[in-house]
Amino acid sequence: MYRSTKGASKARRDQINAEIRNLKDLLPISDADKSRLSYLHIMSLACMYTRKSVFFSQDITTASSAEETTGFLSFYELNELIQGMPGFLLLLTGEGKLLYLSDSVSDHLGHSMVDLVAQGDSVYDIIDTADHFIMRSNLVPPTSPDTDRLFRCRFNTSKSVRRQSAGNKLVLIRARCLSQTPSESSPGSYWTSNPVWVCFCAPLEPHTSRGGTASDRESTSASALESSFFLPCFRSQHSRDMRLHEAQESVSVYLGLNVEILRSQSWYSFLHPQDLSHASAQHCSLLREGGEGRAEMVVRVETADHSWVWLYMVLQLETGETPIVSNNYIISETEAWSVRQQLSSEQTQLSLVLGSSTSQQESVSLQSPETLSSPDQVFTPGSSGLSGQSFDFSTAACSTGSTEEQGGSSSMEPAQVESGPRSSLSSMEEETFFQHEPSEPMASPSSASSPIPVTVATVSDLDFLTQNILLPPAFQIDPPLPVLPLPLPPVPTSQAQQTKEFVCTPPYTPQLGGSNFPFGEPHFSFDPTGATSPPPLGQTATVTTTTAPSLSPSAPSNPQSSPPPPTTTLSSLLPLTITSPTTEILFPVEPCSGSLYEKLPPTPDSPGDGDCTVMTLPEVRGPLYVDVPHGPLPYPPEGLLTPEASPGKQPSLPFFSSLRDREKERTEISLLAQHISTLAEGFYLDPLLAKLVPSTLSEHSQSPDSDGLDSIPLLGEFYPLKSWKGLDLPIFQDDESLFEESVLETLLQDLSSSPPLSPTPSSSSHSSPPSSPSTPECWCPSLHFDGVSAVSAGHFCSVQSAHCNNEAGRGAMMSPVNAGNMTDTKAAGEVPMETDVASSPLFTGIPTSPPLQLTASPASPILMPVSSPVSPPSPGLPCAQSLLEELAALEPMFGAGASIAPGLGQQPELYQLQSHVPQQCFRKDGSGSDPPF
């Protein structure tokens, strides 16, 4: 059975291989190519030639008469014509299946058609993967009478798809659709849904190297000019400033201008005004050192009859007196749409890969102008004019500019954006861009006036923030201070020049509801033209120190409805004056400011390459946080969510503070410590005092002080919970000090209204003397104040560490009570905590003692020695708790008054965990405590 099955399989394979060999003999290729084909290669070529034969035979059969067939070229004539073409011919269907690939492809791509189509019969197998979308979008069936398409594509120059090391070559493709109408073909025909495209491909890169000889350059130009067979073209030579020197005589046919007229004027004088920026940017990229020496542009050129002709120019930088050689292709508006959109998308992708920002003006120029109409949905851009993701940089310069010092002058020129080697200006525009023209101050900016000298003594008292953030770099400091690099301030110019200057597009999310960048609030603006105007209301010419008001972070604001912050304008008649040293923070008053950290420049860890990182943050002792409002929001909060810390971890933790706030906080802490020390001394009196106090006074302490209970407000209802704060205090003022003082006053009044300490009468027959000093007693911390929330108790200062040891040696008398007190005290609104000393692991081997119950009530804490068989006290009887346990339990909540912040390198959320103080053992003789370990 197995032998027969194995033999049948082998017989079938032999039969299939024989048929494939028969197909190889039928292929119209040379015997040398046939001998090196594999079975898969044979099948791929057979499919391609079969599709071509079916398509052309269908065209011949649909001819109405024999006279029409005689008008076609014969096979040999067509073959000679194709071989004489400058490029190569490509026929393919709408889905990318190849029908024909001329043999002349080997002259341009370096490999024959058999080598390129060996492992696939699709055009996507021989082009670069980055251009698959471009090819697919241009093979969409046309929806307009114009069936011509012009686009660029990179073809692989390797034999196999698996070998990509050989690179690729850029080819200009002009495609024409040969689709048939439904009446000419059957409704279910394959060619109805897959129209055939004939593509004339002309390589845009020359065959010779960049530094070839003159004869090689002439042969290269001659071969390039032959591409006008399917695309009108003329060749021209230019100097480094793009002034034309030589041009082909056919330029008079396309432009109506002879070579002498073109030679007498600059090339930029013939360009459309809307295309000047795009042309100058490509010109600069061509002359950039270290570049590839090649550039492309799509511009409109004025003809002799004052009309506009679209030119697709491919510029190549070579050596010699006229180093720039340009092949100029005359294209239509539809083709200009396609090529220009393709250039724009490629430049955007390149800028994202290289991490450099593209020019805003260039992105506008790369979009189609308003005069063009979209001929096809394929070439319709997403939006006309500025895109929705553009940023408004009319108020601040975020680009990394380079200042140049010319002629030993001390004046600083405005920053030039390095979209090319230096800027996006042409060589002629650079000569007149910074010239002073008083008659047109807004149309052409003038040179910046000499800066005001500022010495070190003048700014010695300014803090780090002022010197590095608010002091503009145009001010010369002698000797210079070690400040961070800053961009030059914005120059008020025309809209076209503003978009040319402020071109940095940061990789961040713009503010909600607007296109303003969060770092765009200016502090200084300069008017280099010298034209002065009275500043509007709210603007000053003096650098003043302001403090932003405190706003609730939970209330989201609308950036659109808020007015812009007042800026400081500096002109020649309004000199900059530095005020006296102060401790205020130099920030503008903003009605919708949520946190100062949102307005700071990005840090080195921020996403992006650093083009928009105008400076680095000063070293801050503490974690950085972003203020994020609580509660659900219908949209993300305004400002920037930086990756330094998660905004959900800790809300609203500012880290900049002034020296005055620090001193005020220290004073409040010291006063609070004194008050609590005085309060603690009232709790811990001498144990013998209870014997001297008359027992009749204890009757007043049996009922809680209801008046004091009512006098304490429920502060937790109107004052939010305070979270931990860093070492640096907030610059916004709050009612924290008032709140702490009110709590202290309430507690002091409550204590003053309570009677003196007295032993609680229980049962005279069951009274027992105090326990021996050798018997240890456990102090168990518990926390509850009737009528006072945990927030109020959390404002105690952490002085218990110093006061506990002082009071521990004085001894205390605890009251062991029955376990039934728990239910009674719970009914009274108290939260007791029971601790059995015998069951505690800390007291193994120590004589046990009755269980203790410690509670705290609004009345005065009383220490009462009671024997173990005591009847349950009344619900209103208060049980005492020492201040030691209260303060020990309140220690984790002490963050509102004290400045306890995590150190460098520690996680901030660890300081939000509540620390549990271990139980401590004290002896009545005051000998101290035994360590639990």
Swiss-Prot record:
GO terms for biological process: blood vessel development; cell differentiation; excitatory postsynaptic potential; forebrain development; inhibitory postsynaptic potential; inhibitory synapse assembly; learning; long-term memory. Residues 361-398 have a biased composition (Polar residues). GO terms for molecular function: DNA-binding transcription factor activity, RNA polymerase II-specific; protein dimerization activity; RNA polymerase II cis-regulatory region sequence-specific DNA binding; RNA polymerase II transcription regulatory region sequence-specific DNA binding. One of its GO terms (cellular component) is nucleus. Brain-specific. Pfam families: bHLH_NPAS4 (PF23183), PAS_11 (PF14598). Residues 399-411, 440-451, 538-560, 751-769 have a biased composition (Low complexity). Residues 1-13 are annotated as: Basic motif. Residues 74-148, 220-290 form the PAS domain. Residues 1-53 form the bHLH domain. Residues 295-334 form the PAC domain. Disulfide bonds: none annotated. Signal peptide: none annotated. The keyword Repeat applies. This is Neuronal PAS domain-containing protein 4A. It comes from Danio rerio. The gene is npas4a.
